[in-house]
């Protein structure tokens, strides 16, 4: 039984990376200045940030329609027996709901998974699923593996400001970090499928040190890890600084990644983070 994988643009894997894996990415939408743009197709994260910095209002986001997922599934099933569809947390977006509605049209040939995470947290699950497909595992076997990995996975990041999360209603438990003293940097986690408070420190240098130390603890606790480094536009130097602090640590390096337009709408420019998974489930 051949298996095709479908995901959405919040995996923040580039179109080239998805194509190399044979994975289909369905874009979410950014509503910006009264126009709807497909994430990464019609609007890049850099264009979005440049617009906001020029004084345009912070945009909002929207999920793909069930019809768009149905089209992606139909195309995938032209050359595969089954589809495994992996998506952003249902507590952060209605995307997985659209995917499930579309899946009903295909008589059990499409399995939709809420990964309970976003950006490279989702991206790492897509990469693992692609590896397991190549290894010959079935859809139920892959889903079982992902369900074992998810509770152990971690996504931790810091943002330049909480305003973007607050204005778009995605702040969740991180609302406890609103306000406070000047130069206090929030540390955020995606936990249980939602954004939550991970703590706060004074100054960006300490925030980056916290991210690096978090990776060290995770690698120690899990006997190794897959680690992806991520940043929104403006956070590239800070991402490199976190990586530099880990130059002596052994882990499976999953690369540097730019967060796309949809997640940037919520995280804002200058965000930096790490996505982590155990090496094996």
Curated annotation (Swiss-Prot):
Amino acids binding hexadecanoate:
61, 93
Please give the positions of the paired cysteines in each disulfide bond: none
Q: Which UniProt keywords apply?
A: Lipid-binding
One of the entry's Gene Ontology molecular-function terms is:
lipid binding
Cell membrane in keyword set: no
Keyword Transit peptide, does the record have it? no
Question: Which stretches make up the DegV domain?
Answer: 3-278
Q: Which PANTHER family match?
A: DEGV DOMAIN-CONTAINING PROTEIN DR_1986-RELATED, FATTY ACID-BINDING PROTEIN TM_1468
- Write out the function statement from the record: May bind long-chain fatty acids, such as palmitate, and may play a role in lipid transport or fatty acid metabolism.
Record protein name field:
DegV domain-containing protein DR_1986
> Which organism encodes this protein?
Deinococcus radiodurans (strain ATCC 13939 / DSM 20539 / JCM 16871 / CCUG 27074 / LMG 4051 / NBRC 15346 / NCIMB 9279 / VKM B-1422 / R1)
The major lineage groups are: Bacteria, Thermotogati, Deinococcota, Deinococci, Deinococcales
């Amino acid at each position: 039984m051949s298996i095709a994988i479908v995901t959405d643009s919040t995996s923040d894997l580039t179109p080239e990376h998805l194509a190399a894996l044979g994975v289909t990415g369905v874009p979410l939408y950014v509503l910006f200045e009264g126009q709807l743009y497909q994430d990464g197709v019609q609007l890049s994260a850099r264009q979005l940030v440049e617009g906001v910095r020029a004084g345009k209002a912070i945009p909002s986001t929207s999920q793909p329609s069930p019809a768009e997922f149905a089209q992606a599934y139909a195309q995938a099933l032209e050359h595969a027996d089954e589809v495994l569809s992996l998506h952003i947390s249902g507590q952060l977006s209605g995307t997985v709901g659209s995917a499930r509605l579309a899946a009903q049209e295909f008589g059990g040939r499409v399995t939709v998974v809420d990964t309970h995470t976003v950006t490279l947290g989702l991206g790492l699950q897509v990469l693992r699923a692609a590896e397991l497909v190549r290894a010959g595992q079935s859809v139920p076997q892959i889903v079982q593996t992902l369900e074992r990995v998810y509770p152990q996975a971690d996504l931790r990041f810091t943002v330049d400001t909480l305003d973007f999360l607050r204005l778009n209603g995605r702040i969740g438990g991180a609302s406890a970090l609103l306000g406070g003293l000047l130069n206090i940097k929030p540390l955020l986690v995606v936990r249980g499928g939602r954004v939550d408070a991970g703590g706060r420190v004074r100054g960006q240098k300490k925030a980056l040190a916290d991210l690096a130390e978090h990776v060290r603890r995770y690698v120690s606790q899990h006997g190794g890890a897959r680690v992806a480094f991520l940043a929104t536009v403006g956070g590239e130097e800070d991402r490199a600084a976190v990586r530099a602090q880990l130059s002596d640590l052994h882990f499976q390096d999953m690369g540097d990644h730019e967060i796309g337009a949809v997640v940037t709408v919520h995280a804002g420019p200058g965000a930096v983070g790490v996505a982590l998974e155990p090496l094996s489930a």
